[in-house]
A protein has these predicted regions:
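Thiol-/selenol-based redox modules, centered on thioredoxin-like
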Residues: 18, 155-187
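Thiol-based oxidoreductase modules, predominantly thioredoxin-like and allied folds used
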Residues: 98-115, 129-138
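Short, internal strand/loop/helix patches
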Residues: 118-159
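N-terminal targeting signals for export/organelle localization
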Residues: 1-44, 187
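A short beta-strand-turn-helix
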Residues: 40-42, 47-68, 91-95
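Conserved redox-active cysteine motifs that mediate thiol-disulfide chemistry
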Residues: 64, 72-89
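Gram-positive cell-envelope targeting signals
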Residues: 1-14, 68, 72-73, 79, ...
């Protein structure tokens, strides 16, 4: 059982676009209220290979066996800016992606009001944020993960499946709670 908190939404309510495109139907998820204690659907996280602000390549498949905190944000987004110190602290607290948790930011250069890759990298450096932020230059990841608002954070379990998401800013305490919840749910 996922045991979703009030902060972490089930994946079935926001299945990434790659899972529903062309099906003709909206995906549905069983909930406890629908039919007792049924399990939410297992939805593989869309894989990607993108480059971060340091020029390093990141592929989701490279992190198999680790919990992933995937945060979609924008430099112009006030709530995003508000939670970034807590994301940096989470990144440092869990060993800078060397342990069981991988923290990745996702920025979409040129989308809407967003600046260039260089401007995003400068923003990160000037503010002391060292957690890797991959550049979704073709917006494929933003589309595949169904991003409708910033910030949005997806939790991906060690099996590479979507565990849940939060479509708003979080405190550091909530971030740690959803990370622990995702880790505890793994076999």
């Amino acid at each position: 059982m996922n045991g979703f908190t009030e902060y972490l939404s089930q994946t079935g309510s926001a299945v990434p676009q790659s899972q529903s495109v062309g099906s003709g139907e909206e995906p549905s998820a069983s909930t406890d209220a629908d039919n007792g204690a049924s399990e939410p659907p297992v939805v593989p996280a869309p894989d990607f290979t993108l480059v971060d602000q340091y020029g390093e390549e990141h592929s989701l498949s490279d992190y198999k066996g680790k919990t992933i905190f995937l945060n979609f944000w924008a430099t112009w987004c006030g709530p995003c800016r508000g939670e970034m110190p807590d994301i940096q602290a989470l990144y440092e607290e869990y060993g800078g992606n060397q342990g069981d948790l991988v923290v990745l930011g996702v920025a979409a250069p040129g989308l809407g009001q967003e600046g260039t890759q260089e401007e995003i990298a400068i923003f990160l450096e000037e503010n002391g944020y060292t957690f890797p932020t991959v550049m979704d230059t073709e917006y494929q990841l933003t589309y595949q993960y169904g991003i409708r608002a910033y910030p949005t954070t997806w939790m991906i379990d060690g099996e590479g499946n979507l565990y849940g998401y939060v479509e708003s800013a979080m405190t550091g305490e909530i971030m740690r709670d959803i990370v622990e919840q995702t880790m505890e749910a793994q076999p």
